[in-house]
């Protein structure tokens, strides 16, 4: 029965393509780690403090290939001894016959977050609930890995960015009326690796994430987000070394469909951020903001990425080099308002010192440019067409990141240290002849430990971070006669920069009870403290940053409950 269930997880995930876990309000994909509003690794989540020390994660982390883009890495290290340690009946069943080598888990969880330490678009009171399952199974000539999950989130008094993952795209749209927002995320993930000949494997991974994001108060909006990734791969291996190659194809898309249906007659405003919080402020259905453009439904934006990844391992050393080129646009049909492209290079290195100790190093370089189209509407014979007159580069951002991680894994005690440094340099040219440059740096350290006392696991985590940021402006043509740089959303800029690069510290505590034959229950509590602008309202203004109030000391509490089953 277990064999059938495990196969169902893996096959279902492959047939209905996943990406790892649901994206939270305060998480964004790695591409945009310094894009603007948030960082994916910015603040550790309270419900993550002990997950790295559980059986499934032990097995996953024991094979450095599992962190690569190559699905064939699933079979590169089949840790029979480790799986047998957690599940002795898996290798040889009660009847003495061989069984599939597999490990899986399923869990349901709920989290409540409260506090003013949050990004500009975050909620002071947020709850989320969801369920997920993951499985790895090895058979004689092939292996499968699968996962699926669902998460529902709801936050109060939310406004600012209208996108699901603020900062992922080089354009953002801000709205100014706080209200309740909900986000539902569905994820499916499947990977398979097959031995096709002596020393050769082929495989592939298919990821899918679908999101529905909505606000039910004017200015209300409904978003539909989609991420899909396909990564076929090949691997050659022998007893000494292994070499792999992966092709990567992915698509990300989102559509913001906004409307005002209230009867109060209030005039609602919006702001389109074209880079470094410079852009255009006006009534939300203004044609320059593009939320209500005739001939286009909503604000559609998408990106297609192509790339390759090369993997190599020798003995206990593993490395992966990845390159990704992305092309995207905002708009549709004749109305293409923005076009952007990017290059991303990343390097991962890992070394297993022995069965207990491992170390990982990663680095990323990301360069993205956005251009704004010059369009002209022409009506001839009652037919309106749009002419493309050219484009101007309005924004460029370059991100650099380095991360170092050390793990000690054992049956009695698990320890994880992480350190990271990230930097962004972005230049906006929204209104000629002015240019603005923003430079931001941030670094953080995290220590996480879990003690296993029989049927009880006690986890503790401490983290700290700091950074700096600076915005400068200059005029490339002082004789142009233009006096204004354009609309500047000063509160968005200051709030986001302080959240990303300000000093912060916090910690998590978790307690897990393990019941035989695999059932467990966990409670965790976390706190983060830092500086934030707690009492302010948005108003696009080109005012002086020095006139802003001093930021407040703010905290945020996380409480999480989880129940699950390891099998």
Stretches found by the model and what they are:
Residues 242-248, 256-278, 516-567:
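Predominantly the C-terminal beta-signal and adjacent terminal strand-loop region
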Residues 281-421:
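Long, internal scaffold/assembly segments composed of regular secondary structure
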Residues 85-91, 131-137, 188-194, 230-236, ...:
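Residues on the lipid-exposed face of transmembrane beta-strands in outer-membrane beta-barrel proteins
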Residues 24-52, 60, 236-239, 554-567:
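Outer-membrane beta-barrel "beta-signal"
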Residues 103-112, 146-152, 204-210, 245-251, ...:
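Transmembrane beta-barrel strands of outer-membrane/channel proteins
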Residues 114-122, 157-163, 213-221, 256-262, ...:
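Outer-membrane beta-barrel translocator domains and adjoining extracellular loop/strand segments
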Residues 97-104, 140-146, 198-202, 239-243, ...:
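Outer-envelope beta-barrel architecture signal
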